[in-house]
Swiss-Prot record:
This is Mitochondrial dicarboxylate carrier. Its main location: mitochondrion. The modification N6-acetyllysine is found at K158. Gene3D superfamilies: Mitochondrial carrier domain. It catalyses: (S)-malate(in) + phosphate(out) = (S)-malate(out) + phosphate(in); malonate(out) + (S)-malate(in) = malonate(in) + (S)-malate(out); (S)-malate(in) + succinate(out) = (S)-malate(out) + succinate(in); (S)-malate(in) + sulfate(out) = (S)-malate(out) + sulfate(in). One of its GO terms (cellular component) is mitochondrial inner membrane. One of its GO terms (molecular function) is phosphate transmembrane transporter activity. One of its GO terms (biological process) is oxaloacetate transport. Solcar repeats lie at residues 7-87, 100-187, 196-279. Keywords: Acetylation, Antiport, Lipid transport, Membrane, Mitochondrion, Mitochondrion inner membrane, Repeat, Transmembrane, Transmembrane helix, Transport.
Length: 286
């Protein structure tokens, strides 16, 4: 009998951490662009300003929080999605229909988004800290220090500021990434022209990254503004209204860097994940 392998529940978190290490500078630039009150700088200009002002390593500000986020948010959503998908297809003759993948992706993303909200809050703050005046900087030493100080100084409730938005975005991103990746890979393999190899993984994940970017950009902007606020927004709706006053384009601030960051991040995540599954996955006789 042929031997196949399935993912272990924590592979998604490990793969996402590997991808985050590669794409963190792009994530940082995306946050800087989204938190501008007016559109003053584009992606290249923002990158040059960060390097000139704080040095090249400033592009990696908040990396510990980003990794902490991946080990909460991404680990949770991948674990739920892949475990449930494998369970639901265990005795079936074919893959899940697309609507089932979308439903699974939505549930997994909602849960992962909520679990990852505290780390996401600290991640956004650490990335944006250098833009603040010296007197207003939070100067978190690392992710755990940030989590501890937010809980101590602002209360445990503040750790989940923007949880609704983060969960909603998590659902959209997970549908765009995991559900669309599975579907794209299934369609590519069904043509018979490509086998289950690295190029297939690259093509499928590239499609998934594009889907995820377009699905979640407006919510991503609102989430970033909510998490970086000092209480000026009363909620998601109020934040949306205030953002709308800046014009429709305000909802798509940082669209290019979001795509430039999310598409490579998605590609790297799934290529790492497929290699982890291939070499270290659970053996299944088929």
């Amino acid at each position: 009998m042929a031997e196949a392998r399935t993912s272990r529940w924590y592979f998604g978190g490990l793969a996402s951490c590997g991808a985050a290490c590669c794409t963190h500078p792009l994530d940082l630039l995306k946050v800087h662009l989204q938190t501008q009150q007016e559109v003053k700088l584009r992606m290249t200009g923002m990158a040059l300003q960060v390097v000139r002002t704080d040095g090249f390593l400033a592009l990696y500000n908040g990396l510990s929080a980003s990794l902490c986020r991946q080990m909460t948010y991404s680990l949770t959503r991948f674990a739920i999605y892949e475990t449930m998908r494998d369970y639901m297809t265990k005795d079936s003759q074919g893959p899940l229909p697309f609507y089932s993948k979308v439903l699974l992706g939505g549930i997994s993303g909602l849960t992962g988004g909520f679990v990852g909200t505290p780390a996401d809050l600290v991640n956004v703050r650490m990335q944006n800290d250098m833009k603040l005046p010296l007197s207003q900087r939070r100067n978190y030493s690392h992710a755990l220090d940030g989590l501890y100080r937010v809980a101590r100084e602002e209360g445990l409730k503040k750790l989940f500021s923007g949880a609704t938005m983060a969960s909603s975005r998590g659902a959209l991103v997970t549908v765009g990434q995991l559900s669309c990746y599975d579907q794209a890979k299934q369609l590519v393999l069904s043509t018979g022209y490509l086998s289950d190899n690295i190029f297939t993984h690259f093509l499928s994940s590239f499609i998934a990254g594009g889907c995820a970017t377009f699905l979640c950009q407006p919510l991503d902007v609102l989430k970033t503004r909510l998490m970086n606020s000092k209480g000026e927004y009363q909620g998601v709706f109020h934040c949306a209204v205030e953002t709308a006053k800046l014009g429709p384009q305000a909802f798509f601030k940082g669209l290019v860097p979001a795509g430039v960051r999310l598409v490579p991040h998605t590609v790297l995540t799934f290529m790492f994940l497929e290699q982890l599954r291939k070499h270290f996955g659970i053996k299944v006789a088929t």
